Amino acid sequence: MNLQECLDKLARGKISNLALCENGKVKEKFIPKVVDAINEAITRLYSVFPVKEKAVLVELYEGRTEYPLTSEHSWRNAQGEIDDEYNYYIIDTPEDPFMDDIQSIVEIHDDLNRRRPMNDPDSPLGIMIPEPNLIIVQVALDHRVLQVSYRAKHLILSPDDLTSTIQLPEHLFGALFSYTAYLIHSDMNTQEAVANSQKYYAEYQNIITEIQLNTPFAPDKLVSDKKFIKRGWV
């Protein structure tokens, strides 16, 4: 489902009685407001369920222990300075860019096929993770490559691109619609809006509970084809 289809679904259903909709469409001037609510609802769902897992490759250098996982350190942003190798350690390409979308790190392996302990200060192979997008190696004596697998965030949807795809499993769209409707109604001060916001929040909670109890949830994994690539070797 793309963003326009989501807006139309809401306008024909859970927010159809509001002044921001007309003839089954969200009025143009209110589209940013509804898109903001959709983004918040998606963020909520991604925090509850492991919707997507991805991986990023990080090249370690002797003498460096801290590695912020941000795109400013990616290979595709290197400008050819002398210190490129030291400052640009995230291995990506323009075709497969790192998108600054780390929600939480799941596991870490190195190019010797070792699973690295996380947040274990007693292990020389341990990787400390004080922040979701920062890793600290315990020992920086050799040149290694890490594959960091992580739960990914959904990219922020823009009201300027209504063709953007909403990346959710089909069975989560009901929760998305209910939580979005809850946010929009709760932003209004009428008695009817307050009652509707409570109704849609309860509806959202019921859907989430049912999914957690009855639906096996496997994340959309985008890590299986990742290979360790380092300047000419795999």
What residue spans do the PLM features occupy?
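Glycine-enriched, solvent-exposed interface loops adjoining structured elements
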Residues: 1-234
